[in-house]
């Protein structure tokens, strides 16, 4: 994969705090690139986002691009009823809340292998809204519902776990041996989401 960046920051003027925002954002982006071994192919410079006294919110957006055969691409939409669904947490450093980069890369490599072997029906990255939002979006694509397990940790459903993964498994969870995961539920044939 290659990254591209689009950045919007207020006019910097002579205020050191304003200069610190793009510096911190770009240093963080550079750290992620370096640790994951993923280069950036450039981006569009949109630094001046000010008009009179109005400033844009400081923003750095990254898009990841890659090439593959169409036959190897997947979807985030659940494919069939009766599938087990697993949550794979992104390994993070508890002190800094940053990914543990080496382990994160190993997790992504392992999931890529599972996708290639055809044992993953659907995969989604957890973003804003947490695991619950990821599961809901996976339901919408093919109108396949979802029943959360009774013992699911409800505190994690809306927790900020960005970068974690939700996988619909083709045939059980034996394929996840050696990977940290939690079975969170099962797909169902009714277009509804059940949390008892």
Show which residues each predicted segment covers:
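Glycine-rich phosphate/pyrophosphate-binding loop regions near the starts of catalytic domains
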Residues: 1-101
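Glycine-/charge-enriched secondary-structure boundary and capping motifs
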Residues: 18-36, 41, 45-58, 108, ...
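A glycine- and small/hydrophobic-rich beta-loop-beta segment
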Residues: 87-90, 95-123
């Amino acid at each position: 994969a290659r990254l591209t960046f689009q950045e919007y920051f207020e006019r910097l003027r002579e205020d050191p705090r304003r200069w610190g925002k793009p510096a911190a954002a770009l240093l963080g982006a550079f750290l992620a690139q370096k640790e994951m071994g993923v280069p950036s192919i450039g981006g569009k410079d949109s630094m001046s986002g000010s008009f009179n006294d109005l400033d844009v919110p400081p923003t750095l957006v990254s898009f990841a691009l890659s090439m593959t055969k169409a036959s190897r691409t997947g979807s985030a939409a659940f494919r069939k009823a009766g599938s087990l669904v697993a949550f794979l947490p992104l390994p993070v450093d508890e002190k800094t809340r940053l990914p543990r980069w080496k382990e994160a890369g190993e997790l992504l490599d392992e999931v890529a292998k599972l996708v290639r072997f055809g044992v993953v029906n659907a995969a989604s990255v957890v973003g804003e809204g947490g695991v619950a939002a990821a599961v809901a979006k996976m339901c919408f694509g093919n109108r396949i519902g979802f029943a959360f397990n009774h013992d699911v940790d409800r505190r994690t459903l809306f927790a900020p776990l960005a970068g974690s993964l939700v996988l619909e498994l083709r045939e059980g969870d034996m394929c996840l041996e050696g990977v940290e995961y939690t079975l969170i539920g099962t797909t169902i044939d009714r277009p509804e989401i059940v949390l008892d």
